[in-house]
Curated annotation (Swiss-Prot):
The lineage of its organism: Bacteria, Bacillati, Bacillota, Clostridia, Eubacteriales. Produces ATP from ADP in the presence of a proton gradient across the membrane. The V-type beta chain is a regulatory subunit. Transmembrane segments: none annotated. Pfam families: ATP-synt_ab, ATP-synt_ab_N, ATP-synt_VA_C. Gene3D superfamilies: 3.40.50.12240. The keyword Ion transport applies. GO terms for biological process: proton motive force-driven plasma membrane ATP synthesis. Belongs to the ATPase alpha/beta chains family. Keywords: ATP synthesis, Hydrogen ion transport, Ion transport, Transport. InterPro entries: ATP-synt_VA_C, ATPase_a/bsu_AS, ATPase_F1/V1/A1_a/bsu_N, ATPase_F1/V1/A1_a/bsu_nucl-bd, P-loop_NTPase, V-ATPase_su_B/beta. One of its GO terms (molecular function) is proton-transporting ATP synthase activity, rotational mechanism. The keyword Nucleotide-binding does not apply. This is V-type ATP synthase beta chain.
Length: 461
């Protein structure tokens, strides 16, 4: 029999203090009944002797200290999971948002998940084709990896996220592929864009969407990515699917953490964020991976907007420590009309060498990638030099490198948000661009690959 408490002592913002409690545990789900019969939910955030601090999911407006009844339900916040979730849209707390019926769950799972034993982890080494050349060719995504996208306010990260969700697939695998998409603190227009894009392209059939709007309570924002990851773990490790989890925008999640931390009067850390921000983010990112003996996997692409495009801001800074690289969107490329505006030089995938090569992509992938990086870097350097000294100061070779850099941005990086390139098309395009340079400059590619692929590229020009 659940006890009912009428000892609400204080309500401050999204927090409520309940006095004289007994047998209450951390993270326990709470039901609050208002004087008018309305029911709201919360969870236990802190326990101090006979006092419990409760975090409210639906806000505190209208709560009467004397009339409110509080029940501690003896279980954490859970998500009912089933394969029927595919093709559906939910709110940030896992309730259907698309007008469809409630899901009849196979089971209910704690949204906080269970840490993966490091010894049980399998190493990520399978290529995932996103259809985006700047990622597939140069900063390869590998199954089980966590690869964030660092964006800026106003840059088209939403379009890139939708494109990857539509196009991503594991090559040479018969296993089912699913996408779990979590929109955190998004505007109504952006949420509708995602829903419409998934529906029109048919991507909704293999996807689960969790949408938390900007006007939803901050507490719901903290639960939304955990809801998405719980659904992903079920599909991956119990149904054997390859699951790609895309979470946007992690910055909104961190702002919600800061809001709750301030309401609790905690000592702030860097820029007002709680001191446990690193630990909290790791509880999200570390739920990606592969497990020995399990066919399925979870690959993560968290997307965050860097305040003032600052890479040293605590959110991108700490995210970079936990994840395995970063894809950086450039405002300069965006102004040039390069879409998607991925800046390949500061971008990095730390596991890219594990997912490429013979039997995975193509034998020449690593050499081509190294040569493209080198040539583009030299081309940018030549262009910067011409701005300072004038084009006449450049050697003939420097001019070719500058020409290569322009062609690389316009043809390789820029492909729009609807073009889906195979890895073969991406690699062949790289070879085609390298024909701009003299053969003597292609020092990072083995002779056998030059003989095999360069002549083909020259013929196709």
């Amino acid at each position: 029999m659940l006890k009912e408490y009428r000892t609400v002592k204080e309500v401050v913002g999204p927090l409520m203090l309940v006095d004289q409690v007994d047998g209450v545990s951390f993270d326990e789900l709470v039901e609050i009944e208002l004087h008018n019969g309305e029911k709201r939910r919360g969870k236990v955030l802190e326990i101090n002797k006979d006092k419990a601090m409760v975090q409210l999911f639906e806000g505190s407006a209208g709560i009467n200290l004397k009339g409110a009844k509080v029940k501690f339900l003896g279980k954490p916040l859970e998500l009912g999971v089933s394969e029927d979730m595919l093709g559906r849209v939910f709110d940030g707390l896992g309730n259907p948002k698309d007008g469809g019926p409630k899901i009849i769950p196979d089971k209910k799972l704690d949204i906080n998940g269970i840490p993966i034993n490091p010894v049980a982890r399998n190493y990520p080494d399978e290529f995932i084709q996103t259809g985006v050349s700047a990622i597939d060719g140069l900063n390869t995504l590998v199954r089980g990896q966590k690869l964030p996208v660092f964006s800026g306010s106003g840059l088209p990260h939403a379009e890139l996220a939708a494109q990857i969700a539509r196009q991503a697939k594991v090559l040479n695998s018969d296993s089912k592929f699913a996408v779990v998409f979590a929109a955190i603190g998004t505007t109504f227009e952006e949420a509708q864009y995602f829903i419409d894009d998934f529906t029109k392209t048919g991507a909704i059939d293999r996807a689960v969407l969790f949408i938390n709007l900007a006007n939803d309570p901050a507490i719901e924002r903290i639960a939304t990515p955990r809801m998405a990851l719980t659904a992903a773990e079920y599909l991956a490790f119990e149904k054997g699917m390859h699951v790609l989890v895309i979470m946007t925008d992690i910055t909104n999640y961190c702002e919600a953490l800061r809001e709750v931390s301030a309401a609790r009067k905690e000592v702030p850390g860097r820029r007002g964020y709680p001191g446990y921000l690193y630990t909290d983010l790791s509880t999200l990112y570390e739920r990606a991976g592969r497990i020995l003996g399990k066919e399925g996997s979870i690959t993560q692409i968290p997307i965050l907007t860097m305040p003032e495009d600052d890479k040293t801001h605590p959110i991108p800074d700490l995210t970079g420590y936990i994840t395995e690289g970063q894809i950086i969107l450039s405002r300069e490329l965006y102004k040039k009309g390069i879409m998607p505006p991925i800046d390949v030089l500061p971008s990095l995938s730390r596991l890219k060498d594990k997912g490429i090569g013979k039997g995975k992509t193509r034998e020449d992938h690593a050499d081509t990638m190294n040569q493209l990086f080198s040539a583009y870097a030299q081309g940018k350097q030549a262009k910067e030099l011409s701005v300072i000294l004038g084009e006449s100061a450049l050697s003939d070779t420097d001019k070719l490198y500058a020409k290569f850099a322009d062609a690389f941005e316009e043809e390789y990086v820029s492909q729009g948000f609807t073009t889906n390139r195979t890895i073969e098309e991406t690699l062949n395009l790289g070879w085609k661009l390298l024909t701009i340079l003299p053969k003597s400059e292609l020092k990072r590619i083995r002779d056998e690959y030059l003989e095999k692929y360069l002549s083909k590229a020259e013929e196709s020009k």
